[in-house]
């Protein structure tokens, strides 16, 4: 079993970027291998699973590799979460979470009469509940110290990927 960057080679793999020799040299090795930028893991049966992107990997305080996409996947499975982003801030893992506030208010409206006075408190309770849930599902060094409410949707690329660099 091994872990590292996924490389690909074959007739169906690109030969480089059009009229961009510098960019091509960054991703194509001299012997023709394409460096995908994906982090992969081979299991005991030689099946490849993608852990995340090399440029997104966070190195923890003890040197362990933390894959934010794995944590984001757990967060995004939690009720009322629309999207999330995990970053490292001042040495701590922080999740920024965009939730469906209307669904969340509707959920709590059934339990509490005057929700308008308590909306901020309900969001804080929800985020703490989310943090505990995620920490029960991930390994020790991938534990979140803070979950932050993201009031607006994250800015995205044309391919609908979150522009991570805007949130560091």
Model-found features: residue ranges?
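Conserved adenylate-forming
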Residues: 1-3, 11, 90-94, 101-108
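Conserved ATP-binding/catalytic segment of the ANL
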Residues: 2-60
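Generic structural signal for well-ordered beta-strand positions
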Residues: 43, 49, 66, 157, ...
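Residue-level signal for inorganic ion chemistry
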Residues: 46, 75, 95, 147, ...
């Amino acid at each position: 079993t091994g872990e590292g960057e996924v490389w690909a080679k074959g007739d169906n793999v690109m030969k480089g970027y059009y009229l961009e020799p510098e960019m091509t040299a960054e991703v194509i090795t001299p012997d023709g291998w394409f460096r995908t930028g994906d982090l992969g893991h081979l299991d005991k049966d030689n099946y490849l699973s993608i852990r995340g992107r090399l440029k997104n990997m966070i190195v923890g305080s003890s040197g362990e590799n933390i894959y934010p996409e794995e944590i984001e996947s757990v967060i995004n499975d939690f009720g009322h979460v629309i999207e999330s982003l995990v970053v490292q801030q001042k040495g701590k893992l922080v999740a920024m979470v965009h939730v469906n506030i209307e669904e969340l208010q509707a959920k709590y409206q059934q339990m509490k009469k005057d929700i308008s006075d308590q909306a901020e408190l309900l969001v804080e309770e929800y985020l703490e509940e989310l943090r505990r849930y995620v920490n029960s599902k991930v390994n020790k060094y991938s534990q979140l110290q803070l979950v932050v409410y993201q009031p607006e949707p994250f800015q995205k690329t044309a391919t609908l990927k979150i522009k991570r660099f805007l949130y560091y």
